[in-house]
Amino acid sequence: MKTLLIHSDYLEFEAKEKTKIAEDTDVLNGKMDECLTVFIAVEKDDESDPDAVVKNAVDEIVKTADNLKVKNVVVYPYAHLSSDLGSPATAKEILAEIEKELSGDYEVLRAPFGWYKAFKISCKGHPLSELSRKITTERKEEVKKEKVVSKFYIINGENLELTEVNDEVISKMEDKGLLALLKHELDIKEEGKDNGEPPHVKYIKEKEICDYEPSSDAGHFRWYPKGKLIRDLLSDYVYNLVVENGGMPVETPVMYDLQNNAIREHADKFGERQYRFKQGNKDLMLRFAACFGQFMMKKDMYLLPKHMPLKLYELSTYSFRYEQRGELVGLKRLRAFTMPDMHTVCIDMKQAMEAFEDQLWMGLKTGDDFKTPYAIIFRFTEDFFEENKEWFFGMAKEYKQKYGKDAILEILPGRKHYWVGKVDMAVVDSFGRPIENPTVQIDVESAERFGIVVHDGDKKVQPIILHCSPTGSVERVLCGLLENAYLNTLENKPPALPTWLTPIQARVIPVGDKHAEFALEVATKLRASGIRADFDDREDSMGKKVRNAGTDWVNYVVVIGDSEMESSKLTVTVREESELKKAKKESLTVEELIEKITSDVKDAPKRPLPLPMKCSVQPIFR
């Protein structure tokens, strides 16, 4: 089902002429003021479970109506929203059921199905006044949940003022990243923002990083040598970061038995779509994070206060989430992904809050290292926030001092998840949409559920557990890096990855055959110094070789001709210091070039180039 929801000053219609599928009705005209107008197209997929799509549609309409504080709803059949319409009979039944379900709490006007109608509408024109929704037949877990309506604030870390978010606040926001994150949280969609394919999808194919695997399930990728190298370097980076901060690496299974009550309850609490299947008499699931294995491991440990805070870390290769096919978007949303996952056992809330703060700064450091600045949102239950305001304001103040930015604060009236507090950090893609990456969460449920205890003398203490992904999934990190590379082109800079992550850091290009031997010696020296360098020995023109190096995003392009051989000074194009139409060139000795590249990558992880040194024998994967 496709819907378009318009917050309207009024909607007025008049049925003019029947079609052959028109319903018989006496309601041939009508008008409703101060209403939510819901244009609806019933689709073929809805026929598989009409009850579910009715329930999901009503839930969405109620949520929107309550947010807008309206009590009048117009249900308006509008076939033009879809090219895959369901049968007229099913559409009539579904529309009538939606009207029936809404009528108990709202004044409902339903326009007739199958008539040519004239209508007039006046849209209010505020940020939430036009919303489009795709309603599916997915049946959500039948768990009675109290409706939770959050309040959102902007926290100014300089004067520690909280400003509740409203239309005026949104209209005056200057921080584009924070505004994008806030609009995502408030479900504010902008026309034209979601059109087309994100640039990173083009890049992953064009640069031979990765691609969809057609013989697997949707949302699963094949990784080519360059992409595998980038993933491995990112994995090395997180490993080093976590171990430096006291994390102990472990490895746990990817599959779990849902007959274990703790695992089943935690899986249900998480709420994301999961890969579940039956094998023999067992109901099994593929993990969506490393929580399950790490919690079972902690349950079996004899933990003492002196062990706290205890940090276990796993690079979960892979984690699985059964996302809807229509929601799969390149590396941003997929079904199999690599998640760095650390869980910290803390003896009490005081220690948990200290660890939370440490891990917040660790997460923010990753944005600095990747050169992908984050917008952040803190989320707390109301009770937790009121008890710990000063602690929060201290973090907000330090964040403002370090980054010069405000943050979003979400206050939940009650706890609806296993956590009482969390922080999410996001980069913004080229469409102005957030890519949520690092997160830290304060979990107050899982220790009890899994039977994790700390032995404190004669007492058994149930600890607090922090969930932390210092970077978010490796795939999303790469997504953010590639989207950021595209955004650089809008500022007249060539797209590039940080040098330590670029597969080919340097390429040596001889002008002619007589320069080839010297050029090969230079490439060999670079590789001996731990630099990923190759040598372009192909039978192409000089111009094409230089263009190919640009297409490959090579950070340092070394051209060797007569003058370079005579002077031993190499002509080097430095990509990250260049403009789109103006290359930045330097004259460097081999030793100076090695020193410059080594200084560029600093203490970042290093791996050799997993391709032949000679370009002529490097295979083409796409």
Curated annotation (Swiss-Prot):
One Gene Ontology term, aspect cellular component: cytoplasm
GO molecular function: ATP binding; threonine-tRNA ligase activity; tRNA binding; zinc ion binding
Cellular location(s): Cytoplasm
Assembly mode: Homodimer.
Primary location class: cytoplasm
UniProt signal peptide: none
Family statement drawn from the similarity comment of this UniProt entry: Belongs to the class-II aminoacyl-tRNA synthetase family.
UniProt cross-references to InterPro entries, sorted A to Z: aa-tRNA-synt_IIb, aa-tRNA-synth_II, aa-tRNA-synth_II/BPL/LPL, Anticodon-bd, Anticodon-bd_dom_sf, DTD-like_sf, Thr-tRNA-ligase_IIa, Threonyl-tRNA_syn_edit_dom_arc
Record-given protein name: Threonine--tRNA ligase
Cofactor: Zn(2+)
One GO term of the biological process aspect: threonyl-tRNA aminoacylation
Highest taxon of source: Archaea
UniProt feature coiled coil, ranges: none
Positions contributing to Zn(2+) binding: C291, H343, H467
Species of origin: Methanococcus maripaludis (strain C5 / ATCC BAA-1333)
